[in-house]
Amino acid sequence: MSLALAVDGGNAKTDLALVAEDGSALALVRGPGSSPHEHGLEGALDRIEALLEQALAESGAGDACEIAIAELLLAGVDFPGEVATAKVRAEARGWARRVEVGNDTFAVLRAGTDRGWGIAVVCGAGINCLGLAPDGRQARFPALGPITGDWGGGHDVGLAAVIAAARSEDGRGPHTTLERSVPAHFGLRTPLELAEAVHTGAIDQRRVVELAPLVLAEAPADAVAAGIVARLASEIVALVRVALDRLGPVDEPVEVVLGGGLLQARDPGLLAAIDAGLSELALSLATIVVDLPPVVGAALLALDALGAPATAYARLRSELGAAAAQRNLEPLEVHHG
């Protein structure tokens, strides 16, 4: 029976699954991040290879088994040149007879729909979007962060909360409950104490991503937090609008798959704001919040490449989804670059 390797790699974490053509999940492992931008391409592949060895041992398949397809979906692999280089280097590892490389937004889209096309917006630590037409045409975004005009995701939401808290404290901005809750998250009393801790290195500024759930929680009762959430919803709607414009007219309803930690938290206020914005686009859109980690989408794409039987897809969703839940694999974060 043909085997498939599925990888969803981000800056913070990597999930790797080994599955059979009939959809059975043979192994699921998690390890450190494997973004080429963070670790170099060979360093990223080294990390994936270590996880593959672990998965082979866990599955009992052994080193002698033959993997037909490796589906590697990696954060930060956005440009055609990056994809081509990563594909050549991965092929040289000899993991599988065939290797496919792409950005991790493809994993989220495939995990959320069996149609093979639609729009995916991923909102984890950063934000990204993919549009895929029925005929295969793509609408992509570089998603390199501020340098490509991006705003959104846990980092930007958290940083906005820190800024709002500081301006509330010194009077330059409106009062907000974030003035107390933001420093309290780090065990501090005031935004100024937090600023000093970040300035001196006592607190890593990257930890602002931890504040995103706090902003969502306070938005119903705090106008400033609500404004941050409204901005996030507006950015998501803008990505969908542009993707739709690039893809052109479609004769049937378009599924918009929402993934990543911030969106999969299913915050009612955020989802309502997104739905309201999408309704103004005057198109037939169906919103889907994906419940599965992106590695499941990578595995489904691998089954597509194998020409797996229809029964394999339900089995894979069930078995790999259950394995992910058992190991408490939350949706992976999507990072800029």
What kind of region is each of these model predictions?
Residues A75, A139, G145-P146, L192, ...:
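Flexible, active-site-adjacent loop/turn segments at secondary-structure boundaries
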Residues V77-H175, R180, A324-G337:
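Phosphate-binding/catalytic loop of phosphoryl-transfer enzymes
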Residues L73-V77, C123, A217, G227:
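N-terminal loops that bind phosphate or other acidic moieties
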Residues L73, G102, E255-G259:
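Solvent-exposed beta-strand sheet faces enriched in polar/charged residues
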Residues M1-D63, I67, A111-W117, I163-G337:
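ATP-binding/phosphotransfer module of carbohydrate and carboxylate kinases, centering on a glycine-rich
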